[in-house]
A protein has these predicted regions:
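Extracellular carbohydrate recognition and processing domains
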Residues: 613-639
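Conserved N-terminal/central alpha/beta ligand/cofactor-binding core
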Residues: 58-59, 64-146, 150, 188, ...
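Short, surface-exposed beta-strand/strand-loop-strand elements in extracellular ectodomains
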Residues: 599-614
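N-terminal secretory signal peptides and thylakoid transit peptides that target proteins
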Residues: 2-17
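Short beta-strand-plus-loop segments that form exposed binding edges in beta-rich domains
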Residues: 646-654
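Beta1/beta-strand and adjacent pyrophosphate-binding region of the FAD-binding site
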Residues: 33-43
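A short beta-strand element within beta-rich, extracytoplasmic domains
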Residues: 577, 583-598
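Flavin (FAD/FMN)-binding glycine-rich loop and adjacent Rossmann-like elements that form
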Residues: 163-169, 173-529
Length: 666
């Protein structure tokens, strides 16, 4: 995409390309560049991080090892995997409002609608606007040579062109985690065993999604094991839940169109129809498609993704990618492009295929007005996961399911726990895909600040909001572009606040960070509290007192927070639990109680509401109305902690549940 010189200037510096946005070139063209924040990776996260630093009045640069700006958000992923859209705040939310404004031709405002489907060039235009308004320089073709540390701090990073970047704070916003690795921060790759974190859907997972549903032989000569296996197929599969080093498959998110001016799918150099033998056999067995998705993003174009047992995912082609050199990654990129272009050529042209499949595929082509410098082909490989940091807080399946709740949230995630297939295996003489997991979650959940900064002592001035600390399956939920932007803004905010306070990222006051994040529109709690609303969960660290014995459980759904508690249907009259909220102001509040329902619950639970006028006792039936806020009435309360709600168990006829209370002013 062209960059008008009236808006910005482009310089070439020893092989690096620098885009200057309103900042004198001499300040950044030097051999040594010094700023307040150096951001590695011009992904959507990297852009947002630098913009946030500039909005906080500090200088920042983005250094990018490649030549593409915007990562997947401008690289073909135009149908945003957003989950609970209302939980997307801050600059991420602004980005999607700016997308809508671009299409509508209207100014963007804090109340503008958001749009989550878009053409790649529109996303690029929005990022250009953000960078230009903030005055953020972007350096391209900056590949790390050395990372220098003094004790636990990075002092500078040097590029292979000899240029040096210095700052008090650094951020790794790449999909690969190279800066994190060079800085000596602990990381992992591949899949943990379920036993590592007490999970249920990590490790090897032989399941039914994107699976061969018709019999296909894995052998070079169909049906003959003695002929050997076709390339890319493993002879056996480990038990579900077993750890390994495999990662979920990569592909390109193609921007396709059926417009008359579309670019036909090219036949790549090195094309070999034998690479698609499994697909040919699947079609012979009776499979008729679909072979890829065609989700509309506007302008008559699509965001096209993997779909089915044999599609655009190059399963097994990426195992070495996370730790590969830049040159080796370039080769992996090229191989993925050859594979996927060859697939589309095969589907559109191979004379053995039914005419209906060939004509349906050939009715699509690459959009001629997208990715114009690469022939309509996406310049960004979909790196679904690479390295993942291992820090003081590892996000796991338990966070995704809200069985645990981070006490130091810096943003929300809400997408399905999603892993694409990781390998092809032989099961009972037939080929099967392994690794695809698609498990829903209850709703938006918080991401811990400790998961985006290294463990204390490893590196004190580096934040890692993309390759954050998470298990393989939790990362499958977190790894969405809106979440990366959210976490990057929070990380940049932390970096600037820590610099101002002269403390490490690990020592930064979380209440101070949270206050600034909320002021900047970040969402740190879900559901979002309404004005005058106070919710107190049974798992809260203060405000909940117990008598007798209460047991934690998650066996019945509909609870608020990470769990609920019950009296085990014993010690009636002895077991009691009191919620004592801290109310911000005196006045009338409607009081709500929440529980989970079951036939074994008590139908006659006495609940004492302690208010300014005395004590009012209500009786609730916990066999019904579970998973919702049930009103106990409206009462007057003093400010502070004079009021409370007491659950009693005397003479109750079943399990008594304590989950959460809610006070709503007015």
């Amino acid at each position: 995409m062209a960059h008008p010189l009236s808006r910005r200037h482009v310089l070439s510096l020893g092989g690096a390309t620098l885009i200057l946005t309103g900042i004198p070139a001499a300040s950044y063209a030097a051999a040594v560049v010094e700023v307040d924040l150096v951001v590695y990776g011009a992904t959507s996260a990297g852009i947002v991080a630098a913009v946030q630093a500039r909005r906080m009045g500090r200088t920042a640069v983005v250094i990018e090892p490649g030549t593409h700006l915007g990562g997947l958000s401008t690289g073909g992923l135009g149908m945003t995997d957003s989950g609970v859209k209302e939980s997307i705040g801050g600059i991420a939310g602004e980005f999607y409002r700016r997308i809508h404004a671009k299409y509508a031709g209207t100014p963007v405002t804090p109340t503008s609608p958001a749009r989550f489907t878009f053409e790649p060039h529109v996303a690029r235009a929005v990022f250009d606007d953000l960078l230009s308004a903030a005055g953020v320089p972007v350096y391209y073709s900056i590949r790390l040579s050395t990372v220098t540390r003094a004790g636990s701090r990075i002092t500078e990073v040097a590029a292979d062109n000899g240029q040096v970047f210095r700052a008090p704070m650094f951020m790794d916003c790449s999909y690969e985690g190279d800066l994190m690795d060079r800085a000596g921060v602990a990381w992992t790759s591949g899949r943990e065993a379920n036993s590592a974190y007490g999970e249920t859907i990590n490790g090897v997972q032989l399941r039914d999604k994107h699976q061969f549903t018709l019999p296909v032989s894995p052998y070079r000569t169909a049906g003959d094991p003695a002929s050997g296996l076709l390339p890319g197929i493993a002879a056996t599969v480990a038990p579900n839940g077993t750890a390994d080093t495999r990662i979920q498959a990569y592909n390109f998110r193609m921007c396709l169109t059926q417009a008359a001016g579309r670019i036909p799918f090219p036949r790549p150099a090195g094309y070999d129809a034998a690479d698609y033998e499994l697909l040919w056999r699947y079609i012979q067995a009776g499979y008729t498609g679909p072979f890829f998705t065609t989700h509309s993003v506007g302008g008559g174009k699509t965001d096209s993704n993997n779909n089915g047992a044999f599609s655009t995912d190059h399963i097994g082609g990426n195992y070495s990618y996370p730790t590969a050199s830049y040159a080796a990654r370039d080769a992996i990129f090229a191989e993925h492009r050859r594979y996927q272009q060859g697939l589309m050529w095969f589907l559109a042209n191979d004379s053995r295929l039914p005419a209906a499949i060939r004509s349906a595929t050939a009715s699509w082509g690459l959009a001629a007005d997208e990715f114009t410098t690469t022939g309509g082909w996406p310049p960004q490989l979909y790196v679904r996961e690479a390295r993942r940091m291992v820090s003081a807080y590892v996000m796991t399946e338990h966070d995704c399911r809200r069985n645990v709740t981070a006490a130091d949230p810096v943003g929300m995630a809400s997408y399905t726990m999603d892993s694409h297939n990781c390998q092809r295996v032989v099961v009972d003489g037939l080929v099967k895909n392994e690794g695809d997991v698609q498990i829903g979650i209850p709703g938006a959940y918080p991401i811990s600040y400790r998961s985006i900064v290294p463990s204390s002592g490893q590196c004190t001035n580096l934040a890692v909001p993309v390759c954050l600390s998470a298990s393989h399956i939790a990362y499958g939920s977190i790894r969405m572009e809106p979440v990366f932007m959210i976490l990057a803004q929070s990380a940049a905010t932390a970096a600037i606040l820590a610099t101002d306070a002269a403390v490490s990222l690990q020592q930064l006051s979380y209440p101070a960070l949270a206050a600034r994040l909320r002021a900047d529109g970040q969402i740190l709690q879900w559901p979002i509290p309404t004005p005058g609303e106070v919710i107190l969960d049974n798992a809260a660290s203060s405000g909940v007192t117990r008598a007798g014995t209460w047991l934690s459980s998650t066996s019945i759904s509909g609870f608020y927070g990470p769990d609920y508690e019950h009296d085990n249907n014993t010690a009636k009259g002895v077991n009691r639990l009191r919620f004592t909220p801290a109310l911000p102001a005196a006045g009338a509040y409607t009081v709500y109680l929440r529980w989970t329902s079951h036939t074994n619950r008590a139908s006659n639970v006495p609940v004492d509401v302690v208010h300014s006028g005395g004590i009012t006792t209500r009786t609730v039936d916990q066999r019904v109305s579970g998973g919702q806020w049930v009103s106990l009435g409206s009462y007057s309360f003093s400010a502070g902690s004079a009021g409370s709600v007491l659950l009693r168990t005397e003479n109750t006829n079943g399990y008594v549940i304590a989950d959460a209370v809610r006070f709503v002013a007015g």
